Regions:
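N-terminal subdomain of nucleotide-sugar transferases
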Residues: 1-61, 368
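Carbohydrate-associated surface elements
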Residues: 39, 169, 189
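Short alpha-helical donor nucleotide-sugar binding micro-motif in glycosyltransferases
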Residues: 89, 157, 267-268, 275-280
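Conserved donor-binding/catalytic core segment of Leloir-type glycosyltransferases
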Residues: 199-226, 238
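Nucleotide-activated donor-binding/catalytic signature segment of Leloir-type glycosyltransferases, i.e.
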Residues: 250-268
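Aromatic "clamp/platform" in nucleotide-sugar-dependent glycosyltransferases that forms part
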Residues: 288
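Short hydrophobic beta-strand element within catalytic cores of glycosyltransferases
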Residues: 305-308
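Conserved acidic donor-binding segment of nucleotide-sugar-dependent glycosyltransferases
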Residues: 320-321, 325-332, 341-347
């Protein structure tokens, strides 16, 4: 099979992480997996074996250029996507193509695969609004581009056997926005055995955020909420991830006088991340553009209460008053109050929230995700 992705290792974001785990899981199940993704330079390379998530698979890395306003986003020239698609499909002759984005690589693969009668499955991880954060163009041009992007997405999705997205809320959003029917919600899934939940009160109050430091993540809202917390709580804030907003956020941290309480870790190893999650008191996310949030699921698998913005798909994971709290997006005072609710909870209440996170993430097991996609690839009925 061929998996097409506009972002893949070494990129660090939810879509790339899911695609890596999907590909590795399919290899473990005996499938011959070929991944088509941007190269890290504008250079042609032959297909090669790479080890991803501990599994060997064939990577077809395509010449790409970096989008100048962004620190890591790379793309292939759109007018070359069909050429590369023909080349890969000629060589691999797959039984099925699974695209992870309708933007460039997936767009080309879907059209050529459709012409050749190869079934196409499309998974949407993208909100076009996120991409527009990096255009640096006037809003009226962004609005035109947004309309054109979703119209083109519909043309791509109309060529597929099935369209999936990580949650029911995200599926509803896609059906409304793109005018497609029957979008199937399939969780990105995680391997819960890879995380170490510590169900117990914490000695220190540590909150953590994991994700790209981009505008839609609204990490600045969390920093401002930190200034409204009771100093007696002695709260520290760990920020994991890189992005184009990092310098601005570091400057804001100093401006707010938080430099002794906030640590920017950048990109860290999986082992370091799991250790950080196991030591944290809670996970916080202020993002307004999450179609699921693998980082939130990882925190839940680590038995952390979650404080999240009440936006898009986050309420699918965070049930207010159960495994944490929701707050109005952008509302600094409400976020500070919800953080305080978790940090001042008595031991029994804190443990109840921890166990609710563990219970809530159980339905997102990666094996269920793989079972469902295999059924789609084969054109079979989906598992219950």
């Amino acid at each position: 099979m061929v998996i097409g992705a506009d972002t893949f290792w070494p990129d660090v974001n939810g879509a790339a992480r899911f695609t890596e785990r999907l590909a590795a899981g399919l290899v473990q199940r005996g499938h011959d997996v070929h991944v088509v993704a941007p190269n890290q330079a504008y250079r042609s390379v032959k297909p090669r074996i790479e080890v991803i998530e501990g599994e060997a698979m064939t990577l077809h890395r395509l010449p790409s250029v970096r989008w100048a306003p962004h620190d890591w986003l790379r793309f292939i020239w759109p007018w070359r996507s069909k050429h590369y698609a023909r080349k890969v499909l000629d060589e691999v002759r797959p039984d099925v193509v699974h695209i992870q984005s309708h933007i460039i690589i997936g767009r080309g693969l879907s059209r050529i695969a459709h012409q050749r009668g190869i079934p196409v499955i499309a998974t949407n991880h993208v909100m076009a609004e996120n991409i527009l954060d990096h255009t640096t163009m006037p809003k009226f041009i962004d609005d035109i581009m947004l309309h054109l992007a979703w119209a083109d997405a519909k043309r791509t999705f109309d060529l597929t056997r099935a369209v999936t997205t990580p949650t029911r809320r995200a599926a509803d959003f896609l059906e409304r926005t793109v005018d497609v029917e029957g979008v199937i919600p399939i969780s990105c899934g995680i391997d819960r055995t890879q995380y170490t939940p510590v169900v117990a009160p914490r000695e220190k109050n540590r909150i953590v955020f994991v994700g790209r430091l981009t505008a839609e993540k609204q990490v600045d809202v969390i920093l401002r909420a930190m200034t409204k917390l009771d100093p007696a709580l002695d709260v520290s804030f760990d920020i994991v991830g890189g992005g184009d907003q990092r310098k601005m956020l570091e400057g804001l941290t100093h401006q707010l006088g938080l430099q002794d309480r906030v640590t920017f870790h950048g990109r860290i190893s999986d082992a370091e991340l799991r250790g950080l999650l196991s030591r944290a008191s809670l996970f916080v996310i202020a993002s307004v553009a999450e179609l699921q949030s693998i980082a939130t699921m990882e925190a839940m698998a680590s038995a952390l209460p979650i404080v999240a913005a009440d936006a898009v798909a986050l309420p699918h994971l965070v049930h207010d008053g159960q495994n944490g709290y929701l707050f109005e997006p952008g509302n600094v005072a409400e976020l500070a109050a919800r953080l305080t609710d978790v940090l001042t909870a008595d031991p029994a209440e804190y443990e109840r929230m921890q166990r609710a996170s563990l219970d809530g993430v159980a339905v997102h097991d990666i094996n269920r995700t793989l079972d469902t996609f295999e059924a789609l690839y084969r054109g079979e009925a989906l598992p219950d």
